[in-house]
Regions:
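Non-ligating segments of multi-cofactor redox enzymes
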Residues: 1-244
Length: 244
């Protein structure tokens, strides 16, 4: 399948949060007011105005502190459950750009709270966010405006360590698999997360749960099936609305 893909190599991440700041800056999103929660992670979670978040998982192993860094963002699924769920609900807020594969939200489309909750719950990675004030939904846009002009997404452009990579899907898959083999020599548990169903591929060296609760979708086949079912029932939902 063609289109664009991110490859995020967590083994190179220093949690500088340059990607997080660049995302805010390019999208002109405001800073999120936060309070100290006893962690270096800031803000606490993704939001309507925070599309990219470097998560800090601070654990103890063999009586030594261990940090796992995870630059969280939308996975831009090949078969996006959020989009098919929205369509089955009659919500016209989510589309997919066929050239890049980017899953795009229109934050100006008003979405009912109940529908937004259903859409968010359909996402295995807990990404979609709803704004109570505007009643719109938002998330990572793959910097579609930059990509269409031949530029890298802001987060990739600013990354100083090579953690963030972006390009044609075939090239990114090749890069990811090559890097996986290199890393496995030292970290046998290393794996690529859900590479067969997403356009944001993570390389991790340990149990994904140590990085983040929603780092990996447990049953990729089931997710793909659910998306396919929603795709099939969408015409029926549209017909039902047409008939009143």
């Amino acid at each position: 399948m063609a289109g664009k893909t991110f490859f995020i190599d967590t083994t190179k991440c220093t949690a500088c949060r340059g990607c997080q700041i660049a995302c805010k800056q390019w999208n002109m999103n405001p800073a999120t007011k936060t309070t100290q929660k006893g962690s270096h992670q800031n803000p606490e979670d993704l939001s309507f105005s925070t599309f990219k978040l470097v998560r800090f998982s601070e654990l103890e192993e063999n009586e030594k502190p261990v940090w796992y860094f995870f630059a969280d963002q939308c996975r831009h699924c090949l078969e996006p459950p959020c989009m098919y769920t929205a369509q089955s609900l009659g919500v016209k807020a989510i589309i997919r750009d066929e050239a890049t594969g980017a899953v795009l939200y229109d934050p100006k489309v008003k979405v009912k709270a109940a529908d937004a909750k259903t859409i968010r719950e359909s996402c295995p990675w807990n990404i979609p966010r709803w704004d109570q004030k505007t009643t719109g939904m938002a998330k990572c846009t793959m910097c579609i405006d930059r990509v269409k002009e031949g530029l890298l997404p802001a987060c990739v452009k600013t990354c100083p360590t090579g953690t963030m990579n972006f390009g044609e899907r075939a090239k990114m898959l090749e890069m990811a698999n090559k890097r996986l083999q290199e890393v496995k020599a030292k970290y046998p548990k290393a794996q690529l997360l859900n590479a067969e169903i997403v356009r944001t591929i993570y390389l991790v060296i340990d149990d994904p749960q140590k990085y983040h609760k929603f780092a990996s979708a447990e049953d990729a086949e089931e997710i793909t099936s659910i998306a396919a079912i929603k795709k099939l029932i969408r015409p029926l939902a549209n017909l039902s609305q047409f008939l009143g």
